[in-house]
Amino acid sequence: MASLIQVRDLLALRGRMEATQISHTLHAPQPMIDAMLNQLEIMGKAVRIPEEADGCLSGSCKSCPEGKACLREWWALR
């Protein structure tokens, strides 16, 4: 079972990561990692870094059938 401290330490070691990467590295369920990251954000220890939409090939994510699923979200320590 992963702990909040392990998530924080992993972000400290790797710099920035996606929640799915953290989940796989710590062998923890994705919803649990999401909750831990949100808690770290509330505590002011972590920051969410959304990927810019300028990487979209067509430039029209609103009309994309995937919605904004192609946009990645990174996490890093403050």
Swiss-Prot record:
Keyword Transferase in annotation: no
Positions of iron-sulfur cluster binding: C56, C61, C64, C70
GO molecular function annotation: DNA binding; iron ion binding; iron-sulfur cluster binding
UniProt keyword annotation of Transcription regulation present: yes
UniProt entry keywords in alphabetical sequence: DNA-binding, Iron, Iron-sulfur, Metal-binding, Repressor, Transcription, Transcription regulation
SUPFAM superfamilies membership: Winged helix' DNA-binding domain (SSF46785)
Pfam name, any one: FeoC
Purpose: May function as a transcriptional regulator that controls feoABC expression.
Family, similarity comment: Belongs to the FeoC family.
Protein known as: Probable [Fe-S]-dependent transcriptional repressor
Organism: Salmonella newport (strain SL254)
